[in-house]
Design a protein with these regions (language model features):
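Conserved beta-strand scaffold positions in the cores of enzyme catalytic domains, especially
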Residues: 46-48, 101, 119-121
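Helix-adjacent hinge/juxtasegments
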Residues: 49-52, 56-97
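Active-site-proximal beta-strand elements of phosphoester/diester hydrolases
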Residues: 3-11, 71-78, 118-123
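Active-site environment of divalent metal-dependent phosphoester hydrolases
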Residues: 11-16, 37-41, 53-58, 80-84, ...
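Short beta-strand scaffold segments in enzyme catalytic cores
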Residues: 63, 110-112, 135-139
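Core catalytic region of metal-dependent phosphoesterases/phosphodiesterases
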Residues: 2-69
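A short, flexible low-complexity segment enriched in Lys/Arg and Gly/Pro that occurs
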Residues: 27-30, 96-108
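Binuclear metal-dependent phosphoesterase catalytic core
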Residues: 16-18, 67-68, 95-97, 120-144
Length: 144
């Protein structure tokens, strides 16, 4: 079984990036869904994408990776707009031939399965919105 630790929208609170790793030291993958506002060297152990507040970062806009039989796509949520966001997310995921989309931006945790697609937003570790608490998520993937 593989363990994926996912966070997003830490917005310069670099100690939270370290804290999540301390809380989840046995992760096989560490993923940051953007708006880390961190220098590249701080994210060496992370799969990290560029968010709308990562102005000077050289992180990619999206990352694809595979764990067991699942294909993951990581992209910050600002790419999906606000009108009909879910449709845009599903379309992007299907175009990338992936099963799971990990995204941030809204600072609100979300887990949703739609049309064979899984959409996950871990929320924010520092600036939660919509009545949510500070959060990150852990995903366990079992092999066949």
């Amino acid at each position: 079984m593989k363990k994926i630790v996912v966070m997003s929208d830490s917005h310069g609170y670099h100690q939270m990036i370290n804290r999540v790793k301390e809380l989840e030291p046995d992760g096989d993958y560490y993923v940051h869904c953007g708006d880390s506002e961190a220098e590249t060297y701080m994210m060496q152990d992370w799969l990290c994408v560029k968010g709308n507040n990562d102005w000077y970062s050289d992180f990619p806009n999206q990352i694809k990776f595979k764990v067991e039989d699942l294909n993951f796509l990581v992209a910050h949520g600002h790419r999906f707009g606000y009108m009909d966001r879910e449709t845009s997310m599903i379309y992007t995921l299907q175009e990338a031939n992936c099963d799971v989309l990990l995204s941030g931006h809204t600072h609100v945790p979300m887990y949703k399965e739609v049309d064979g697609c899984t959409l996950i937003n871990p929320g924010s570790t520092t600036l939660p919105r919509g009545g949510s608490n500070r959060s990150y998520c852990v995903i366990y993937v079992e092999g066949k």
